């Protein structure tokens, strides 16, 4: 096949091979051919395992809390008081600066109808935004489909979560920003060179233009990643490294709408104070550094962080100084676009559902506000209905 006889069939075949190859790379390496629109980013943090909301946002003024947890309750003297009889776990102290600036929001009693205490089932519900468990598409995957950009979001981690699964494809997962570069397999680079050197019109010309744009954008992003210098000192932890990668992607101009990462495990059936205290401290230290980094880069106004867990824990401690799977829990959000404060009432520890805090705020309402108010997307289409949120955005 010479440079002069590259017909439409050959061109499309090469394009398909190239697209398949690039789709296996980190998401932003191929997103220039699609336009996501907007310049704001939502960072989603998954607290895997079922974080105990009562020891995160502590109802320290409620005697029932201490009666139910004689061994694992956070002492009143240690609570970081916020108001409404609630306060943060002491390990969250690095976030007090954001609270004082009105840039940290807590959402109380968040859950969904007919709660499921299975990790797998409940996480799937949060990932798909479908309590009926009928959907196989993630809510972030549906964002990708709505805006027509299969590279509008990435997961920073290892396995791609269901939240980032679209109908016909999975959005990319990046295990480490340090560990990649654009490398086309043997033969594919020659195919690209041949494809881009031929003269053509119509559909083939459009694909050529898109490919050139993609490669140009890829080179620019890679150069920016190489130039990135953290604007804050990050703690030495895996999660802090993930948040640093998130900051690097944002600062490098990837234009992605959603970046997703996880921390865990919060499945604290035994020895909860040791494990949860450590994880909350790891989260808080990393988020403080991340936000300081964004401020230094001049990007703080463009980023909001939202955190969730698949369920909370039971009110009463168990015999192993831990807690078992529960129902309602807390969500959090931080950033300049956040309406700081506590959204929702303090949990009712007298009126329980089989020993669990009763959910009062559907998590889809929290999602909806992020989709509509921050990303300027049609939440109704993405979530399959209208859901009222707690008002956590400015």
Residue ranges and their predicted role:
Residues 1-297, 316, 330-394:
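Feature for exported/extracytoplasmic and membrane-associated proteins, marking the mature portion
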Residues 303-311:
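Acidic/histidine-rich, metal-coordinating catalytic segments
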Residues 312-316, 321-330:
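A post-motif C-terminal structural segment
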């Amino acid at each position: 096949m010479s440079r002069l006889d590259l017909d439409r069939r050959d061109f499309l075949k090469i394009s398909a091979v190239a697209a398949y190859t690039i789709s296996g790379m980190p998401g932003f390496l191929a997103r220039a051919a699609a336009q996501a629109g907007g310049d704001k980013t939502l960072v989603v943090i998954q607290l895997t395992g079922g974080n105990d909301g009562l020891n995160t946002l502590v109802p320290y003024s409620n005697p029932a809390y201490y009666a139910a947890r004689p061994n694992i309750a956070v002492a009143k003297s240690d609570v970081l008081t916020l108001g409404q009889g609630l306060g943060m776990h002491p390990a969250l102290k690095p976030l007090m600066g954001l609270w004082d600036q009105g840039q940290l929001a807590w959402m109380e009693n968040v859950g969904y109808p007919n709660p499921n205490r299975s990790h797998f089932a409940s996480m799937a519900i949060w990932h798909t935004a479908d309590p009926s468990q009928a959907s196989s598409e993630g809510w972030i995957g549906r964002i990708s489909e709505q805006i027509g950009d299969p590279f509008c979001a990435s997961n920073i981690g290892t396995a791609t979560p269901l939240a980032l699964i679209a109908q016909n494809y999975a959005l990319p997962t990046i295990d480490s920003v340090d560990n990649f570069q654009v490398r086309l397999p043997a033969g594919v680079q020659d195919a690209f060179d041949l494809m881009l050197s031929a003269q053509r019109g119509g559909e083939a010309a459009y694909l050529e233009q898109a490919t050139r744009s993609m490669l140009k954008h890829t080179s620019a992003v890679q150069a920016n990643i190489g130039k990135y210098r953290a604007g804050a000192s990050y703690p030495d932890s895996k999660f802090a490294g993930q948040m640093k990668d998130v900051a690097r992607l944002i600062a490098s101009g990837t234009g992605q709408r959603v970046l997703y990462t996880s921390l865990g495990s919060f499945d604290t059936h035994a020895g909860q104070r040791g494990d949860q205290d450590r994880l909350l401290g790891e989260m808080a230290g990393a988020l403080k550094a991340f936000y300081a980094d964004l401020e230094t880069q001049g990007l703080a106004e463009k980023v909001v962080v939202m955190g969730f867990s698949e369920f909370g824990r039971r009110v009463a401690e168990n015999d192993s100084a831990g807690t078992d799977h529960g129902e309602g829990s807390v969500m959090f959000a931080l950033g300049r676009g956040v309406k700081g404060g506590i959204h929702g009432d303090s949990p009712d520890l007298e009126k329980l559902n089989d020993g669990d805090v009763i959910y009062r705020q559907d998590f889809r309402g929290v999602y909806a506000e992020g989709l509509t108010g921050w990303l300027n997307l049609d939440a109704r289409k993405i979530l399959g209905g209208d859901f009222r949120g707690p008002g956590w955005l400015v």
